[in-house]
Amino acid sequence: MWTYPEIDPVALTFGPLQIHWYGLMYLAGFAFFWGYGSYKAKFSDHWTAERVGDFLFYGALGVILGGRIGYILFYDLAHYIAEPLDVFQVWKGGMAFHGGLIGVMVAMWLFARKMQVSMFVVADFVAPMVPVGLFFGRIGNFINGELWGKVTDSSLGMKVYDPTLNMVVSKYPTQLLEALLEGIVLFIILMFYTRSPRPLGAASGLFIGLYGLFRFYVEFFRLPDPQLGYLFWGWVTMGQLLSLPMILIGFALVVWAYRNNRVMAP
C-alpha cells in the first residue's frame, strides 16, 4: 500500500509570486497540443502549424472559462454565490471537465466558421490530443491532494490524511486512475484509430463516448463532492449523471458517421 507523498502545490516562488503545479499542468497540456498538433498538421489538407497555434488560443479560453463556469454551475453554485471572489482562485482547483467540453465545443464551432469547414473537421483533429491534457489535469489534481476515492483496504489504496476524519486512511487514488484511463488509454486508442481513414465525425464520437464510459466507471471508486453527495439511489454521482449522455451521444455519433457520412477524414 502506497503513502501519499504530500507534494507542495506551489512549484516555484519568486518573491510574492507563486507558480502552482496545477497551472503548470495546464501549460504542459497546451504545449503538447501545440507540438503534436503542429506535427499532425503536416499530413492535413485543412491544418497548418499556424492554424494550430490560432486554435490553441480559442481552445485554451474554452477550457478555462468553460471548466470554471461548469464547476460553479454543476458542483458548488451556493458557495460561489456566497463567496464570489473565489471564482478567480483557479489555482486551487475547481474545474469541471463537462463544462470545459462545452467551452471547447463553442471554441471549435467559432473556429470552424473562421476556417469555413464543418465543425467535425476541427473536432476530429482536436479529439486525439485532448486526453493528454486530461492526463496532466488529473496529475494536477493529485498534486493538490483533491478528488480522492473511497476508503479501501485494497492494495491499490494510498494512505492519505483525511481532515474530516482527523486520521490517516487508505483511499483509492482516483485521480491517477482517471489519468490512466481518460488520459493514457484514451490517447492510445484515438492515436491509432485516427491513423486510418474513417468517416468525418467518427473520431469525435469515439472520444466523447469512451470518455463518458471511463468517467462513469471511475465514479464508482471516487467520493462524490461533499456539497452534493449522491444524487440518486445512494450511488449516482453528478459526474455519472453528466457522463451518461456523453456515452449515448458519442457512440450514436460513431454509428451515424459510418452509416451516413461518406466524407472520409485522413
From Swiss-Prot:
<comment type="pathway">
    <text>Protein modification; lipoprotein biosynthesis (diacylglyceryl transfer).</text>
</comment>
<protein>
    <recommendedName>
        <fullName>Phosphatidylglycerol--prolipoprotein diacylglyceryl transferase</fullName>
        <ecNumber>2.5.1.145</ecNumber>
    </recommendedName>
</protein>
<keyword id="KW-1133">Transmembrane helix</keyword>
<feature type="binding site">
    <location>
        <position position="138"/>
    </location>
    <ligand>
        <name>a 1,2-diacyl-sn-glycero-3-phospho-(1'-sn-glycerol)</name>
    </ligand>
</feature>
<feature type="transmembrane region" description="Helical">
    <location>
        <begin position="14"/>
        <end position="34"/>
    </location>
</feature>
<keyword id="KW-1003">Cell membrane</keyword>
<keyword id="KW-0472">Membrane</keyword>
<feature type="transmembrane region" description="Helical">
    <location>
        <begin position="91"/>
        <end position="111"/>
    </location>
</feature>
<dbReference type="InterPro" id="IPR001640">
    <property type="entry name" value="Lgt"/>
</dbReference>
<keyword id="KW-0808">Transferase</keyword>
<dbReference type="GO" id="GO:0005886">
    <property type="term" value="C:plasma membrane"/>
</dbReference>
<feature type="transmembrane region" description="Helical">
    <location>
        <begin position="117"/>
        <end position="137"/>
    </location>
</feature>
<comment type="similarity">
    <text>Belongs to the Lgt family.</text>
</comment>
<keyword id="KW-0812">Transmembrane</keyword>
<comment type="function">
    <text>Catalyzes the transfer of the diacylglyceryl group from phosphatidylglycerol to the sulfhydryl group of the N-terminal cysteine of a prolipoprotein, the first step in the formation of mature lipoproteins.</text>
</comment>
<feature type="transmembrane region" description="Helical">
    <location>
        <begin position="235"/>
        <end position="255"/>
    </location>
</feature>
<feature type="transmembrane region" description="Helical">
    <location>
        <begin position="55"/>
        <end position="75"/>
    </location>
</feature>
<dbReference type="Pfam" id="PF01790">
    <property type="entry name" value="LGT"/>
</dbReference>
<dbReference type="GO" id="GO:0008961">
    <property type="term" value="F:phosphatidylglycerol-prolipoprotein diacylglyceryl transferase activity"/>
</dbReference>
<feature type="transmembrane region" description="Helical">
    <location>
        <begin position="201"/>
        <end position="221"/>
    </location>
</feature>
<keyword id="KW-0997">Cell inner membrane</keyword>
<feature type="transmembrane region" description="Helical">
    <location>
        <begin position="172"/>
        <end position="192"/>
    </location>
</feature>
<dbReference type="GO" id="GO:0042158">
    <property type="term" value="P:lipoprotein biosynthetic process"/>
</dbReference>
